[in-house]
Each structure stands twice: as C-alpha cells, then as structure tokens.
Amino acid sequence: MSGKSKKVKGTKQTLEYVEQPEKLHVKAIKCKNAKQKEFLKTLDEKIITVCTGSPGSGKTLLALYSALKALEKGQIECIYLVKPVVQIPGEEVGFLRGSLEEKLDPVNWSFYGNLDKLIGESWRKKLMAEKKIISVPIAFLRGVNLDHARVIVDEA
C-alpha cells in the first residue's frame, strides 16, 4: 500500500494514511466465454439464479461483481455473503474464539480474495464495517428482510 506521510504539529510523530476514493468503484472484468456472459446476464435479470460449474470457473467472482455493481449503482443496499459452516470430517478446526465475524473469517477467505480483486482490501473492510457487505451463516437469515439486498450463497 502506498500512502502519504503527514507530520503532526507539536509532536515527533508521523502518521501514515492511504487515500481512498470517496465513491465505490468496481474494477471492470471481462467474461472469458459465452457461459460466463450468460451467467452475468442472468444475475442482473433474474431474482434467483443457481449456478454450477467446476472450481475456478468464475462463479463466485462473477456473482460478487454483479452484486458490487448493483451496490455501486444504488440498486441494492447491502450484500449478504453465505457459506456453509459445516466442518468436513477430518478437517475439524475445533472451537474458535471471538465474535461471529472472527469465527466466519476463515470460511470467507475466498470471498475476501475476490472482493479485494474487484474493489481493493480497504474498500472491502469499509463496506463490511458499514454493514454494506455482511457475512452470515444461513441459519441466521431466518426472518431477515432481504428487500434491497443481494444474497450470494456459495459452495452450498
């Protein structure tokens, strides 16, 4: 990260800060094939879209891109990120301390990596702090009003 330094008057302290654009800007992506184009079009046109594909085919990246573009345009107010939190036998991690967000962090690393590609780490953290991007276990969505939101259920 490149930042600027600013000397604080009356002290020997120098603060580092990173300039961040005021408005969300989602990096443009280019679909690699016709199926990706069709998936992206379906995400923008349909209320519910179900997609299957091999690992690395762009399902998560395209779903996040579509949701971020809708957020950028003001078409939605927030994005819910949902992944199963069920442990796979033989891959148990045991009890995790901390808040719900801290417990879900390891599960959401693939979301975070893709979000960082599209908007950068600082914007991801900003939108998460503002509850514009919300990570939640699916069980916690019961009774939640999803008007003006995009829900991405990954690896279900």
Model feature map: region roles:
Residues 45-51, 148:
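Pre-Walker A (Motif I) flank of P-loop NTPase domains
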